[in-house]
Amino acid sequence: METRESEDLEKTWRKSASDQRNTDNEPAKVKPELLPEEEETSQADQDIQDKEPHCHIPIKRNSIFNRSIRRKSKAKARDTPERNASCLADSQDNGKSVNDSLTLNIPRSRMPPCRTAMQTGPGAQKMSESSSTPGNGATPEEWPALADSPTTLTEALRMIHPIPADSWRNLIEQIGLLYQEYRDKSTLQEIETRRQQDAEIEDNTNGSPASEDTPEEEEEEEEEEPASPPERKALPQICLLSNPHSRFNLWQDLPEIRSSGVLEILQPEEIKLQEAMFELVTSEASYYKSLNLLVSHFMENERIRKILHPSEAHILFSNVLDVLAVSERFLLELEHRMEENIVISDVCDIVYRYAADHFSVYITYVSNQTYQERTYKQLLQEKAAFRELIAQLELDPKCRGLPFSSFLILPFQRITRLKLLVQNILKRVEERSERECTALDAHKELEMVVKACNEGVRKMSRTEQMISIQKKMEFKIKSVPIISHSRWLLKQGELQQMSGPKTSRTLRTKKLFHEIYLFLFNDLLVICRQIPGDKYQVFDSAPRGLLRVEELEDQGQTLANVFILRLLENADDREATYMLKASSQSEMKRWMTSLAPNRRTKFVSFTSRLLDCPQVQCVHPYVAQQPDELTLELADILNILDKTDDGWIFGERLHDQERGWFPSSMTEEILNPKIRSQNLKECFRVHKMDDPQRSQNKDRRKLGSRNRQ
């Protein structure tokens, strides 16, 4: 009798164990808010379902992905049954989420692809409990709903973990780099990152593709894996500037970020976006530090005040105090935004407001650059006391060996760099989102400020240049007014005109080529001959729109680098043709490009940028020497529109569509087509025109308003 009872007990125990294993093999459906009394009813319903045929089970539940989830959940349940039970009981009894530190025990590869709903109410409490308990994460059936939620991950994390004000201010104070150093390190790192990305994609393209395991092999590998909690995946390497010697930190390296657990929740693209916004804030802090040094160390120096006349000091330092005040307020607002939450909500709304209302001080400062440079050179030449004092101040350890002139150009460098930083943010925000609209508006305002700065500089120098040219010209034909507010010089130089072989009475052959001098303005061509006294005698002219050029095929050394210039209507209202010879191939192409800018180039026409034309990135800075040349900054990306055999490239810079010539030795070519395509895609996104949908969205929202409740 006792033996039969023991056998019955053993069968009952085996049956319960078998039912438990079957339950473990199914996706977790037990909600954390269920009471212990309800678990028996749920278990009984599960037993009935196990006996019924499985004809209505969705296909998703039997996928490779969900089989791996069930297998890992089963392994964790075997290893830590007591811990799971205690965590579940605590969360049910106390009604609190175990996930206080925002650390979700969901592998990054198992998370929804883009958006996750995490609300700060009772519903969010339930989801937090289920996700914080190992093995009881959101079921695969729930993930599509989470992914389709309109609440973005950044909005969900808003106001969860603010950064203490003292901690953030200490970080700002610890930035040991002056802006000149910060900017150089950042651009050099950008170049190196592109090189690495180019090499990685080339390796993936040329090498063997990654091995794809069959479902059977994948199951065998996972069965052999030891039962262990999900491992933390390596964080994406955004850049390599976290050098301990440079004191240049990344957002993801902040102690508050590491301890909060948000790096386990955010997607890699969102982390890159956070890094882009963080760089804008920290670079502004570095810029403010350098600008403050210009004022305190140089401008307010008592000896400099005694040496310089007030008018000289005004030209030299301009309105730098106004620029410093704007930078201080701008940085303060960025600091407040950082203190609100460890996950930065946005910074482009602040940038937009300041660009629209306060950055006009940059236009005033930069427009004075021509007079500032001239005054500085004159002071160095004429006042020895000033020259010696500046050299002495530059040796101070505060200046880090940087020259005084590098501090004077800080505002122009900053306003240009700020536009590029907003572009980096714009490339990483989600498309058709509010943050994209805000970034586009901020970029548009900054672009207007930068253009106004450039026009201010050019206007000052162009006016003086036009007056100087007008004084040197003597007209053999009807006089043409040169000075105009809408006219500026594009190119000037000497060419040789082919006049044809002629024989004089003494049977001596005259010269085949005669020197002429061309002044090409944006709307006018003036053809001259140089005469003694540094004067130019004008003998022909034509509107620039009535010029045509044609390149001759190489017909030997004599006719090398020869092209035909045709004036459809010259000063005498008739057509004229000139056969001109340049000193080199690059000089010939540069003249042809300037004279007729709408002709087709070697790689792509000027009316189309859709072709996969070659690209280069600048690895050495270059300052334009002539009006048709392009000044290059480190890390600039350019489309190659034309190039010559003697080492010159005619290109278009992607971030502002400026075109010009530059030496090929200043750049290196981007060989990978995927990188080139990505660069063009980002360029089109940054410069896309406002569509009707975006215009409607812009009317509905108010810039700068944040929902922080």
Curated annotation (Swiss-Prot):
Superkingdom per UniProt: Eukaryota
Annotated SUPFAM superfamilies: DBL homology domain (DH-domain), PH domain-like, SH3-domain
Keywords, sorted A to Z: Cell projection, Cytoplasm, Developmental protein, Differentiation, Guanine-nucleotide releasing factor, Membrane, Neurogenesis, Phosphoprotein, SH3 domain
All copies of domain PH, residue ranges: 488-600
Modified residues (Phosphotyrosine): Y179
Main localization category: cytoplasm
Changes after translation: Src-dependent phosphorylation at Tyr-179 upon EPHA4 activation increases the guanine exchange factor activity toward RHOA. Phosphorylation by CDK5 upon EPHA4 activation by EFNA1 may regulate dendritic spine morphogenesis.
PROSITE patterns linked: DH_2, PH_DOMAIN, SH3
Start-end of Basic and acidic residues biased regions: 1-34, 686-698
Single biological process term from Gene Ontology: negative regulation of dendritic spine morphogenesis
Subcellular location as annotated: Cytoplasm; Membrane; Cell projection, Growth cone
Secretion signal span: none
Domain SH3: from-to ranges: 611-672
Biased composition (Acidic residues): 213-226
One GO cellular component, as annotated: growth cone
GO molecular function, one term: ephrin receptor binding
Region (Disordered): 1-143, 194-233, 686-709
Record's keyword annotation contains Membrane: yes
Pfam families, per database record: RhoGEF, SH3_1, SOS1_NGEF_PH
Stored PANTHER family: EPHEXIN-1, GUANINE NUCLEOTIDE EXCHANGE FACTOR
Subunit text: Interacts with CDK5R1 and EPHA4; activated by EPHA4 through the CDK5 kinase.
Job description of the protein: Acts as a guanine nucleotide exchange factor (GEF) which differentially activates the GTPases RHOA, RAC1 and CDC42. Plays a role in axon guidance regulating ephrin-induced growth cone collapse and dendritic spine morphogenesis. Upon activation by ephrin through EPHA4, the GEF activity switches toward RHOA resulting in its activation. Activated RHOA promotes cone retraction at the expense of RAC1- and CDC42-stimulated growth cone extension.
Domains as described in the record: The DH domain and the PH domain are both required to mediate interaction with EPHA4.
Protein name according to UniProt: Ephexin-1
Species for this entry: Pongo abelii
